[in-house]
Each structure stands twice: as structure tokens, then as C-alpha cells.
Amino acid sequence: MNPSPLLDLIDSPQDLRRLDKKQLPRLAGELRTFLLESVGQTGGHFASNLGAVELTIALHYVYDTPEDKLVWDVGHQSYPHKILTGRKNQMHTMRQYGGLAGFPKRCESEYDAFGVGHSSTSIGAALGMAAADKLLGSDRRSVAIIGDGAMTAGQAFEALNCAGDMDVDLLVVLNDNEMSISPNVGALPKYLASNVVRDMHGLLSTVKAQTGKVLDKIPGAMEFAQKVEHKIKTLAEEAEHAKQSLSLFENFGFRYTGPVDGHNVENLVDVLKDLRSRKGPQLLHVITKKGNGYKLAENDPVKYHAVANLPKESAAQMPSENKPAAKPTYTQVFGKWLCDRAAADSRLVAITPAMREGSGLVEFEQRFPDRYFDVGIAEQHAVTFAGGLACEGMKPVVAIYSTFLQRAYDQLVHDIALQNLPVLFAVDRAGIVGADGPTHAGLYDLSFLRCIPNMIVAAPSDENECRLLLSTCYQADAPAAVRYPRGTGTGVPVSDGMETVEIGKGIIRREGEKTAFIAFGSMVAPALAVAEKLNATVADMRFVKPIDEELIVRLARSHDRIVTLEENAEQGGAGGAVLEVLAKHGICKPVLLLGVADTVTGHGDPKKLLDDLGLSAEAVERRVRAWLSDRDAAN
């Protein structure tokens, strides 16, 4: 028996619109089953997509996509959208090398109206499209679909503020599941999920107390009264929820509709048809459940936000085998260092912009809850907030991904560096990140950090050096950033101490002849592998700023040529810093600069991506040998 007779008919939204509305609930079930199977094979974002199935079907059923524009915020919930827009048979390639991207991507499909990956951009982008359509005299509709987690970011409110004052036809769908990746924080989620009216609860309690004894004596009366009580509570909650939400968004100039059940697809279709006919800014408040339809994800949406594979819901836990201990990830090394340091220093505080699990802060929050601050998806605020803490003598550590640190660049300069405030940035996911692709790659931090005055920039080559540099930069009386990659370390033993190294000094990892490899961070390991074959010297620079000028000059004068290696953009990166030192000292030597060229990277297996970029050990060897051969031929 065909498990998906309706879904098999759909290769585009045009096919979807041929279905009767009464068939849509069945289609939703088939689509959810397909998601379970496809994500179970490929991994990827999971719980968010399960929660957006009915909403996605309804949007494509009502709106004339791709003529009408759907802009998905972040893109975590875009898999059903991809399935319904002609990519169903490619879902087995999701996030794989050469396959479908894990986020909407304009070059992948005409249905992907705007490329995303970071949060809170959808309203601004959809507003721009609506404004353009008005200028062009088009009657197309633009829709922004944004989660309540993304609504905690200032950019979303900037767009709401602007949209409410513009005469454009825009729909904002607020997908309210009370989650971002972790549970939401801040006043806005509490506002959206406000409790029932207190007076109603008080009244119900009084009635129960005064009538309970009587009702107990009447058969079935107490059960009936409990049902009435539950219904009154539910109505009170919905009324209060709607009243408060309406007040907020209508004050922004939007006409508010909701909240509505985001899993009742037939009702969603009716509501969206009505909204599509309206003029001006509209906001639809939809209530969904993250992980809907898969009990494990419903019960633990944080764990199942993104998965590598899926266990069977009924599968028994298998006894663990005696396996060798896995190498720790850099994130784990940071998390342990942070807890160790906090236990010894009561001034240490940790800040994260809604990335508790990803940044390794779960244990810290449990052990030091008063010194843990999750500020929501608000990177700009996170940095300035850290500056305020530093002004009062605290020792802030901002745990943040490299790609998200980009969103707070002005705050880095204006609020931290210009005031020389001692804030430590633990910059995770530096370099290639793999399946999440270019929107999440950390390829620019060395370039944009090293030009900031007062900033110390460090790049460890292994997990023990990561701990050393974290301890060193924490004790520096200046702003500092330690950038480290995603994934496991090299397997070296990690100290439990708080040893430090001299700021701005590198070390020689291997002595060789003629060719000197000046390597930074994750590129030290491939440099060592290639140096063994070429008998080259390898310097682990440790710091990009201040850079070890003395070591660079010594290597340049004692070797015939230099190769710089970094997992960062070549423009403005660490290799450029080496060239600046050579120019400053009047040294003219052949230099091969190896980094990420001026290109947008792909997604998939990090090893394949590094090979494509010429930064795997094998690729570095090929490039260096070719460079040496060309130089020999030229001479």
C-alpha cells in the first residue's frame, strides 16, 4: 500500500492547490511521515520542521507562490517548504556535499524568495519586497514567517516599527512555539504566553471551596463542574492571550489576528484566505508545538532541534559497549574551563545569545545560575551588556559563534574596544562548519577582529592550547577573543590547570630547512603533516594580534621562503598580518598565502570543503609543491 498517495501527486504548489481542502489533514500526516524518514537518514533540523507542516501547507495552498513571496526566518522550519516546491526527491541529499542546502537559498529554487540562516531578517526582507511591489504597481503579496524566538532580536522590532508606518500589503506570521533552539528568554515570550486572568482563577477557587462539599453528594456533578472549570480557564487564557498580543502589535500599526491553532490546516486555510484579501500590515499569531507528531521531539525539543539520526520511538536502550573515550570537542574544552575558572573566581559571568547547548554552557548554568545570562537572540545587546558588567568589575565571558559575532561588530568596536574593557569572547565554530554551509561558516573573524584597537586575538592549534589561551586571555586586562573550530580536537592530553602563556608569542613546532610554515589555529596540524614530507619548519603562532614580529622576522631571515596558513578569509586575515610585518622590517622574501579565497563556500563534509578550498593537508601539499616548482622553473 502506498504510504503517501497525496504527497506523491505533488511536485509543486500548483499540484497542492488542486487538492480539496478536506484532503489537507491527510497530506499533513504524509508529509510529516516523509520528514521523519528523510531527516532520519540525512540528519538536520528536525523539531522546528515537524511543528511547521500544517502552516507550510496552508501558506502554499492560499498564496500564489512563487509569484507571491514567502520569506522564512532563519530557515530551520523550511524543509516542508522544500518538499512541496519540487525538491522532494532530493531530500536525501539535504545538507550533504553537492546536495540541497539546509536553509532557503535563492540560487536553489525560485520559491526561495530570500536566503537565510541567521535569525530575525524575514520581516525586513519581506517589507522590502512589499515596498518594491508597491512602487512597481504589482499586486503580489509578501509574507514573513518568523518564530517567537527570532522575535526577541532587535532587528525584528526595527522592521515591525518601520512596517507599521508604511502603506504596504505585508503579512507577518508569528509561529509561536515558545522555543528558539533553547526555551525562549526575556519579557516578550512571557508577554506572548501570559497566564490566565488572576481574577478568574480567584473566582474559580472561591466557587470550588464553597460548593465542593455539596457537589460531592450529587452523582456526576463534581466531574461536570471540573469540565466547566477547565473550559472557563481555557477561554480566559485565550482571551487574555489575544488581548495582550493584540495590544502589542496593533500599537506597531499591524492588524492582529489570533492566536489560532497552527495544526488545524483547514482553519488555517480559511484564515489565510481572509488575510490575503486585506490591505495594509497584518500579523497572524499561530500557536504550534515544536516536534509535533514525534513524541521524543515533543518531550525534548531542545535535544531534537537538530539531529544526526533518529532513534525508533519504541527502541529499547541498548547497553553501552566498552568504547575508548572520545576526543573532547573544543566546545567541551571551553565549557569545562569555564566552570573550573568560575569555581575559582566569583567575578566570572557567562553570556550567551540563545546558544546554551551549542556553546557548551549547560553545566555552567546548572552550577552557577546567578552568573549565567541568556539574553536571547540579541548579539548586539549581549556584547554591550558584557561591557556594562566589565565596567563594574565583573569578568564577562561571551560565548558566541563566529558567524553570529558579525552581528555585533559596532558594539565590539564602540562599546568594548574603544573603552578597553576586559571582556573575553569565546568564539566557537571558527572556520568551516560543514553541513550548515556559508551562512554559518566562521571565515571572517580574524579579518574583522585584528583591525580593532586594544583587541587580543588568539587561535589555538589543539584542545590543550585552547585551554591555555582561554586562561591567558581571561587574565589580560583588555578585550580578547579566542577562536576555535567546531568538532573534536586532535587528541592531545588537556591540562586541568590554569597555566598561561606569554601574550603575542608563538612557538616552533618543527625545525626544518628552507621553507617556513607560519600557521594559525586549526591549520597547524596540516602544516605539520606537510612539513614532514618537505622538511619544513612549522611555527604555531597562537596569536594573530599582537602577532609575534620577532619570530616572523627570525624565520624570514633564516629561510628561503614562507608559507602562511589560516582557516579564514585571505583578505585582511592572518597571512596579511605576516606580510605587514615583513614590509615593516624591509624583508623581501617569497610568500605563499594560503587561506579561503574570495568565494562563497559550500556545505557538506568539512573535509571535502577544505579540500575544495585547498586547505586540507593533501591540498596544501599539492599547492606548496606546485608553487615551489613554479619558482624553480622561473629561476
Swiss-Prot record:
Species per Swiss-Prot/TrEMBL record: Neisseria meningitidis serogroup C (strain 053442)
Keyword DNA-binding among record annotations: no
Gene3D superfamilies (UniProt xref): 3.40.50.920, 3.40.50.970
Catalysed reactions, semicolon-separated: D-glyceraldehyde 3-phosphate + pyruvate + H(+) = 1-deoxy-D-xylulose 5-phosphate + CO2
GO molecular function: 1-deoxy-D-xylulose-5-phosphate synthase activity; magnesium ion binding; thiamine pyrophosphate binding
Keyword terms: Isoprene biosynthesis, Magnesium, Metal-binding, Thiamine biosynthesis, Thiamine pyrophosphate, Transferase
Description of how the protein assembles with itself and partners: Homodimer.
Enzyme Commission no: 2.2.1.7
Function: Catalyzes the acyloin condensation reaction between C atoms 2 and 3 of pyruvate and glyceraldehyde 3-phosphate to yield 1-deoxy-D-xylulose-5-phosphate (DXP).
Pathway: Metabolic intermediate biosynthesis; 1-deoxy-D-xylulose 5-phosphate biosynthesis; 1-deoxy-D-xylulose 5-phosphate from D-glyceraldehyde 3-phosphate and pyruvate: step 1/1
UniProt family annotation: Belongs to the transketolase family. DXPS subfamily.
Classification via SUPFAM superfamilies: Thiamin diphosphate-binding fold (THDP-binding) (SSF52518), TK C-terminal domain-like (SSF52922)
Free-text comment on the cofactor: Binds 1 Mg(2+) ion per subunit. Binds 1 thiamine pyrophosphate per subunit.
Residue numbers binding thiamine diphosphate: 76, 117-119, 149-150, 177, 294, 379
Alphabetical list of HAMAP family matching this protein: DXP_synth
EC primary class: transferase
Biological process, per Gene Ontology: 1-deoxy-D-xylulose 5-phosphate biosynthetic process; isopentenyl diphosphate biosynthetic process, methylerythritol 4-phosphate pathway; terpenoid biosynthetic process; thiamine biosynthetic process
Record-given protein name: 1-deoxy-D-xylulose-5-phosphate synthase
GO cellular component, one term: cytosol
